[in-house]
């Protein structure tokens, strides 16, 4: 694919190696990213090990320092690019949109979470008081409205976030972010699952519940742990494995909940490389679980379905919209209901796998990786053409 568009991918926090590699395949790419998350997330090392053609500009500083330095960076560099792709729709995108508007460079925002719903989870968890909740939500809505007016386009990742973004940005459509590589995330039969578990040093004969969610305010690890413990009391010989940068916090939480013999069945591993190691865990599992208080989409359930692995998930946000008919959905914060779904998958393995394989067809059709980047390139090219046409009309005085 010819890469002619000059794109600046502007990131205010963490991002995914899969998206950066895919984006680099469709454009001449520069990534501007805060230094600390770039290193801490492992992205710097993973990019160095990849064959992606990309230049990375690291911007130092904490929240305020990054905001100021990134403003200067964008002011100096914006016109070097045909389009700026800005991650999320808050403070980082404010810099991108203001400078893009002043310098005539179109900005496309990509939104992977619902900012207000995610922020409200902090209040639900008691992490902030009422006054901070009101102030924070006011600031978020202000940023969303400003960015929504200035952005050339907003991509909500999936139909749920498309509808959320449309409330503040009239030029909104569905984006697929990095999509799902359905050749890499593929089904494994019973014998292959057993072999994968031996390779990964996981219990071969146990019912394996896989949780790839990080510990954060919008995730609901407590419900996952309680549900697995309940299912075990009803005869399910299960292990629960968490994979990610926060796995030690997950293990600590299991201890805090005083779950019976948690040390013997709650397992944790560091994050696996999402392009070379992660799929084996999905393929080896009996079920993937994701519980959330708020969720814009949830890529892990889609990746599990691509592997033909049954999914149990909270019916909230984008998961309620995307997974209906393909996953076992449960009410918010309901360990009892989630435990019952674990037991159902255990008792009905063929039916559960058949449902998941229907989900795989859905993922291939709607979320495959190739489609994701073809669609993204089309959006970027359309925005650039419209901007160039508007600029030409302005010069001609029309």
Residue ranges of predicted features:
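Conserved acidic donor-binding segment of nucleotide-sugar-dependent glycosyltransferases
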Residues: 327-335, 344-349
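Short hydrophobic beta-strand element within catalytic cores of glycosyltransferases
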Residues: 310-313
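N-terminal subdomain of nucleotide-sugar transferases
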Residues: 1-52, 398
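Conserved donor-binding/catalytic core segment of Leloir-type glycosyltransferases
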Residues: 203-219, 225-228, 241
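Aromatic "clamp/platform" in nucleotide-sugar-dependent glycosyltransferases that forms part
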Residues: 89, 293
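Nucleotide-activated donor-binding/catalytic signature segment of Leloir-type glycosyltransferases, i.e.
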Residues: 251-272
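Short alpha-helical donor nucleotide-sugar binding micro-motif in glycosyltransferases
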Residues: 280-285
């Amino acid at each position: 694919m010819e890469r002619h568009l000059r794109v600046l991918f502007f990131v205010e926090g963490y991002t995914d190696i899969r998206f950066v590699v895919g984006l680099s395949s469709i454009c001449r790419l520069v990534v501007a990213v805060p230094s600390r998350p770039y290193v801490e997330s492992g992205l710097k090392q993973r990019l160095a090990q990849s064959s992606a053609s990309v230049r990375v500009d690291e911007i130092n500083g904490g929240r305020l320092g990054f905001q100021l330095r990134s403003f200067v960076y964008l002011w100096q560099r914006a016109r070097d690019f045909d389009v700026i792709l800005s991650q999320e729709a808050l403070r980082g995108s404010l810099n991108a949109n203001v400078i893009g508007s002043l310098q005539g460079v179109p900005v496309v925002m990509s939104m992977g979470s619902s900012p207000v719903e995610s922020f409200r989870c902090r209040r639900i968890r008691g992490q902030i008081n009422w006054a901070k909740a009101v102030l924070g939500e006011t600031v978020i809505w202000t940023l969303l409205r400003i960015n929504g007016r200035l952005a050339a386009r907003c991509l909500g990742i999936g139909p749920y976030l498309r509808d959320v973004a449309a409330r503040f940005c009239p030029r909104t459509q569905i984006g697929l972010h990095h999509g799902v590589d359905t050749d890499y995330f593929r089904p494994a039969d019973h014998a292959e699952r057993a072999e994968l578990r031996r390779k990964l040093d996981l219990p071969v004969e146990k019912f394996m519940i896989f949780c790839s969610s990080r510990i954060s305010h919008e995730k609901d690890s407590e419900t996952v742990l309680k549900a697995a413990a309940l299912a075990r009391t009803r005869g399910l010989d299960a292990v629960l494995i968490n994979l990610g940068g926060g796995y030690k916090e997950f293990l600590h939480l299991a201890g805090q909940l005083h779950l019976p013999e948690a040390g013997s069945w709650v397992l944790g591993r560091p994050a696996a490389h999402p392009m070379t190691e992660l799929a084996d865990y999905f393929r080896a599992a009996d079920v993937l679980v994701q519980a959330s208080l708020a969720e814009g989409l949830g890529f892990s359930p889609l990746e599990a379905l691509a592997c033909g692995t049954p999914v149990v998930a909270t019916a909230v946000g984008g998961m309620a919209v995307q997974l209906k008919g393909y996953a076992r959905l449960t009410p918010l914060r309901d360990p009892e209901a989630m435990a019952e779904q674990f037991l159902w998958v255990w008792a009905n393995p063929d039916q559960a796998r058949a449902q998941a394989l229907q989900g795989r067809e859905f993922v291939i059709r709607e979320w495959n990786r190739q489609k994701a980047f073809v669609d993204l390139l089309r959006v970027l090219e359309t925005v650039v053409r419209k901007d160039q046409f508007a600029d030409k009309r302005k010069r001609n005085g029309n």
